[in-house]
């Protein structure tokens, strides 16, 4: 668990750098709720690095001006096999 949290730090820092230093200077254009950066943070924390990056990449590829979608798109729940 500790190792998982440590490995997430660089990704969380990059996302926060974007959110607080870059995003305020560009127009808001995310077509989804939660925003793509919020989605990325939640995906990484919920699913870990590999699946979190996969989900984030898929989300970023869907979020563009030509997308016909404009809606609530939460991070999928983590499946617990039991």
UniProtKB/Swiss-Prot annotation:
The keyword Cell inner membrane applies. It is found in: Cell inner membrane. Its main location: membrane. The keyword Cell inner membrane applies. Signal peptide: none annotated. One of its GO terms (cellular component) is plasma membrane. Keywords: Cell inner membrane, Cell membrane, Membrane. It is a peripheral membrane protein. InterPro entries: Membr_insert_effic_factor_YidD (IPR002696). Belongs to the UPF0161 family. HAMAP family: UPF0161_YidD (MF_00386). Could be involved in insertion of integral membrane proteins into the membrane. This is Putative membrane protein insertion efficiency factor. The lineage of its organism: Bacteria, Pseudomonadati, Pseudomonadota, Gammaproteobacteria, Thiotrichales.
């Amino acid at each position: 668990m500790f190792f998982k949290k440590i490995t997430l730090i660089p990704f969380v820092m990059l996302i926060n750098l974007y959110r607080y230093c870059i995003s305020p200077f560009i127009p808001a254009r995310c077509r989804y709720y939660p925003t793509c950066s919020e989605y990325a943070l939640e995906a990484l924390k919920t699913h870990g690095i590999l699946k979190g990056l996969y989900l984030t990449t898929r989300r970023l590829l869907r979020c563009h001006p030509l997308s016909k979608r404009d809606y609530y798109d939460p991070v999928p729940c983590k499946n617990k096999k039991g």
